[in-house]
Amino acid sequence: MLSPSQSLQYQKESVERALTCANCGQKLHVLEVHVCEYCCAELMSDPNSSMYEEEDDE
């Protein structure tokens, strides 16, 4: 079982982890959860975002 000081330290570290980006470790904005906007844009980029109209082979 954790001592009161160990428990307090664990809580402090837990809050710090919750307020940092899971990918790069940058501090998160109040409205961000898990990852920062830069990592989100990088991780969630759509590989089909520049699709071109397919040509018919008739």
Curated annotation (Swiss-Prot):
Protein encoded by which gene: ninF
Superkingdom of origin organism: Viruses
InterPro entries, alphabetized: NinF (IPR008712)
Protein family per UniProt: Belongs to the ninF family.
Protein name per its UniProtKB record: Protein ninF
